[in-house]
């Protein structure tokens, strides 16, 4: 490949791979004509999809792999038996310097396990975290961790805050993003020892972070802060709840507009506004969760997305590489000294 930016792609990951993946790469090529792609997977299936588009063929190189990681494979099983899989080899391309970042719509647990093993974490980072953007009344907010770490200590949350702040500056183009820790209340005395300890460290440190204290569940939609930090268990439940609520209200609206002739007329009158709302909350627009803290750019696409959604995940990876995201995290982590724990051990709820 030339000196162009190269993105490695697990072409066999996702519900409708490789067709959806290749179609997503086609869309990404139009947005980023100077980017090249390494496609890992079954060449017999990928080749014909690429060959039909001369412009796409010019920017794609196919690397045949004999296997793919299934969606239901356990991470430990995938790591043991999947070292010749499209997922493993696409990540390995980043480690070898053949690509600047990797994108997969495959098994999340396997992707994270392999990425941690192959890429390792950045110096000073204990655990990587999964981060993504979610729509709010004010625009978008970064939320992390979304499932990589079910249990976290205070230092993990501080690291997440640092990485999330850099992520917000990079993807949202914010000069000084605001950061909050998810809690059961906004008062300083509420919550577990872990969240209060993390809050105290961020409040008392010399880190250049606009830490706003604790936020609650309803602050997610309000956009109270630009970055919401939480453990992976809470974050994953929060994300799935938000997705489920969006589907619920969408079905409520559909049922209401189908309930009578007058309601159908009401839909026709309000269709333009409803289409704007739909576009604003379209999950494909926010597809592309970043594995923060790894020594390489790794982006996870939703497995059930379509070509547009996958192209947006590719766009996230490309933007992060071009803006030197990992280098920025290294610089910020290097500023962190041992932050004192100043919170008492009593439980306030």
UniProtKB/Swiss-Prot annotation:
InterPro entries cross-referenced by the UniProt entry: FA_synthesis, Phospholipid_synth_PlsX-like
Annotated pathway: Lipid metabolism; phospholipid metabolism
An example Gene Ontology molecular-function term: phosphate:acyl-[acyl carrier protein] acyltransferase activity
Principal location: cytoplasm
Keyword Cytoplasm (UniProt): yes
Gene3D superfamilies, A to Z: Isopropylmalate Dehydrogenase
Keyword Cell membrane: no
GO cellular component: cytoplasm
Enzyme class: transferase
This enzyme's EC code(s): 2.3.1.274
One GO process term, biological-process aspect: phospholipid biosynthetic process
Keywords for the protein's UniProt record, in alphabetical order: Cytoplasm, Lipid biosynthesis, Lipid metabolism, Phospholipid biosynthesis, Phospholipid metabolism, Transferase
Task of the protein: Catalyzes the reversible formation of acyl-phosphate (acyl-PO(4)) from acyl-[acyl-carrier-protein] (acyl-ACP). This enzyme utilizes acyl-ACP as fatty acyl donor, but not acyl-CoA.
Summary of subunit composition and partner proteins: Homodimer. Probably interacts with PlsY.
Family membership noted in the UniProt record: Belongs to the PlsX family.
Protein name: Phosphate acyltransferase
Organism of this sequence: Rhodospirillum rubrum (strain ATCC 11170 / ATH 1.1.1 / DSM 467 / LMG 4362 / NCIMB 8255 / S1)
Taxonomic placement: Bacteria, Pseudomonadati, Pseudomonadota, Alphaproteobacteria, Rhodospirillales
Annotated gene: plsX
